[in-house]
């Protein structure tokens, strides 16, 4: 059984990166984007669906980030919500090289927003749970 994690990250990256900068684990390079997606944690479980083959259930967390620089009440969660909607459209029929996607499920963990004296950061999350064969 081949670990599907890198194939899932590649499929997500290919689907999202043309619309929003997409990174694996952390922002890299010299750019400092204010809107981006991080392909964060991945978990997987083996489901022995029947005696002939295995299925994998793989959960991948997307961290959708929108940063507003400035002091005071800057920015709005609206842009982050719009990003989430767009990303859902981009990934809704995602296919994984070398696997058949049996089921797709989406979970939406609580938002994580923060403010400092110089910026406000809004973060939404989408957990994509794929059942693969």
Model regions: which residues?
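Charged, amphipathic alpha-helical segments and their flanking helix caps
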Residues: 1-29, 43-133
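A short, hydrophobic beta-strand-centered structural micro-motif
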Residues: 33-43
């Amino acid at each position: 059984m081949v670990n599907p994690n890198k194939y899932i990250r590649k499929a997500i990256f290919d689907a999202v990166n043309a619309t929003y900068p997409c990174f694996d684990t952390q922002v890299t390079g010299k750019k400092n984007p204010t809107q981006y997606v991080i392909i964060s944690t991945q978990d997987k479980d083996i489901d022995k669906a029947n005696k002939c083959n295995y299925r994998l259930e793989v959960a991948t967390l997307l961290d959708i980030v929108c940063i507003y620089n400035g002091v005071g009440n800057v920015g709005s969660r609206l842009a982050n919500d719009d990003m989430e909607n767009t990303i859902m459209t981009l990934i809704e029929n995602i296919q994984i090289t070398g696997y058949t996607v049996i089921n797709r499920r989406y979970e939406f963990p609580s938002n994580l927003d923060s403010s400092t004296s110089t910026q406000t950061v809004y973060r939404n999350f989408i957990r994509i749970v794929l059942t693969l064969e």
